[in-house]
Amino acid sequence: NLNEVAVRFPRATCFAEGTCQDPQLVLMQSDSGVLIDVEVSGNSYYGYEILCELVCEKGTIRLPVAAEPIVRSYLQCGQAIPEDWTNRFVVAYQEELQYWVDYLQGKTDVPGPGAEDGYEACKISDALIKAQTTGQWETVEA
């Protein structure tokens, strides 16, 4: 369970529009003392990318970069970075919807995330919004 959250604002990117503060560093502290940091940039000039790494006591775990071909040609080597989320998550959203349909039809007995999970996410979101405004660590409602 998360008990405290904070949001920090590094130097803003020149690509942020209006009053948007971008990037943002989100910090979340769990009851057991685990510290989670999430770096968010809504105006990444180079494209859409999700990176995730767990740093643990005995090693690290990193999600793989989305499977994209690496092209070597004309003295260059690289791969495309998608413009948005649609290509990366279309299959995941289809599978999630199918799982829900299967549950409604009695084909599986585990419904997945429910109202209580959504309520917990809302409490964390409320604390994060407050932390964006105050610049302080904020307590997540119990």
Regions found by a protein language model. Name each.
Residues 45, 85-98, 113:
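Active-site loop of classical SDR/Rossmann-like NAD(P)-dependent oxidoreductases
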Residues 31, 102-142:
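C-terminal helix-rich "cap/oligomerization" subdomain common to oxidoreductases
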Residues 1-35, 41-46, 116, 120:
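Rossmann-like dinucleotide-binding domain that binds NAD(P)(H)
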Residues 71, 94-100, 125-126:
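A general structural signal for well-ordered alpha-helical segments in protein cores
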Residues 29-31, 55, 74-76:
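A generic structural motif
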Residues 46-48, 55, 64-65:
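C-terminal substrate-binding/catalytic lobe of Rossmann-fold NAD(P)-dependent oxidoreductases
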Residues 52, 68-78:
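Short polybasic amphipathic segments
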Residues 32-34, 57-60, 79, 109, ...:
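Short acidic/polar mixed-charge low-complexity motifs
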